[in-house]
């Protein structure tokens, strides 16, 4: 289902450039050390919480964050502010699984471990859910790459689960110079896409009960169902190592920027082309991957694949997506998209480590993207990902319209608020 939505978006977006036109706040005490647009402030809700990945904020303000590694005997950290000062004074850990996906739905806390989606019953007034859990979906194979299971609810009883591909480009020998791509790629049967399940049915199996909603997505850690438009969106982590494996086709500079991190409007039946294709934001087109005979310019079979609605520079790690529906922030942010970029590891100039904003009109971007929250890395220039002080990973919206950001480096959660001058 080829849709040339990308062509509607202004060219500046495709080049991955942005213009920070808003004046930034210059009062570190009011922004908890972050750089934010004028009028916004930040406070630290909790810190040293563990490797916090994604999070949800309940209607009463309680926060639930998934953990990549167990801490204090649990894979979920629960926070409550009982004094009203904005800071969590109660922090509890629970859960038998670690992972990334987390969500609140119909009185349950859902959790995405690497091989199973489970849910815990919430009790009114209680911070910690019931300890027993039920399996919603399982049968996911255990892998050593892109094993996380982030998910989104559509509000109509369905849950959409990312099943990342355990490979770079589906080569006969993964991440090996000279190894050809498998054609057809056998991984696509149960990986490299988004599967849909019933959000309420128990003990579903990926291959028996799941529905492959979209394919050709290498790994989408950031997904969100846009309730206003009734559409699923995702951001893909693009493939790696073009220059390392194909130095005759790609310079180091090209490999730094390519391929794009793709912002996807995911429809039923979408095919975004991985592993056969990638999106080149400089040429503004899908390009045939070198493992499948591409030369960095040829489109070939990729002409039939779906394009992104927006393309970001390569290797900056989009790890969460949130469409803002609150009333606290100025009107320009209403129904626009916030994206948390985890930061790069495989480029000579490290980029990302920030949260950006994309304005929307209807189902597509309506203008240039801009950096919304910055300063997480702790320095304007870092040599590698390990030097970053914080790495943004999760986003959530509070009942008052505040934006929450968590990092998985030091386990810090920030609350971003806005007050008219």
Language-model segments: residues:
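Beta-strand-rich domains and repeat architectures in extracellular enzymes and scaffolds
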Residues: 43-68, 317-323, 339-340
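Conserved beta-propeller blade signature
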Residues: 62-66, 108-111, 158-162, 231-235, ...
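C-terminal motif of bacterial Sec signal peptides marking the signal peptidase cleavage site
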Residues: 14-16
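Beta-propeller domain segments
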Residues: 22-38, 148, 165-208, 216-219, ...
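Surface loop/turn motifs at the tips and blade-to-blade linkers of beta-strand repeat domains
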Residues: 45-49, 92-97, 136-143, 211-216, ...
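Residue-level detector of Asp-centered blade-edge/turn motifs that repeat once per structural unit
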Residues: 57-61, 104-106, 153-156, 224-229, ...
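Asp-box/WD-like beta-propeller blade repeats and closely related beta-sheet repeat scaffolds
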Residues: 90, 99, 105, 115-154, ...
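Blade-level signature of beta-propeller repeat domains, shared across WD40, Kelch, NHL, RCC1
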Residues: 396-421
